Amino acid sequence: MRTQLKLTRDGDAFIARLAPSQASAMYEALSYLRGRDHGDTELILLVGAGREAVDALLERLAGRHTESRDFRLTLEEIHMVHSALTAAPTMFIERGGLFAQEPFHIRLGFYRENFDALAYAVVRAVAEA
């Protein structure tokens, strides 16, 4: 998975050129958290936004992407994505505090280190924009 990410400022938003795997990882993280039986309060705690905002971003990230494309994202949407990438793995902590890699990979289609690297790239890209 490509872990480099470049953001360009566009007024009070950012233009992100996302590789297909990046858009897919962001979608999977958000949709997994959105699909759990969380109310708005829990979802806001996890990703910083309620169902309506998450659904709107999911709609934009959805689809089978075959090539890189640009997404215009607000800082709030970037925060949602970053939070989802870091929060989703915590839902796979088993008794004893161990991370369940196989169920995570089966459900989300990525390894935890992919989510970690992409979350780190998001922070770096915002800092450099």
Task: Give the residues covered by each predicted segment.
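Positively charged, low-complexity terminal tracts
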Residues: 1-129
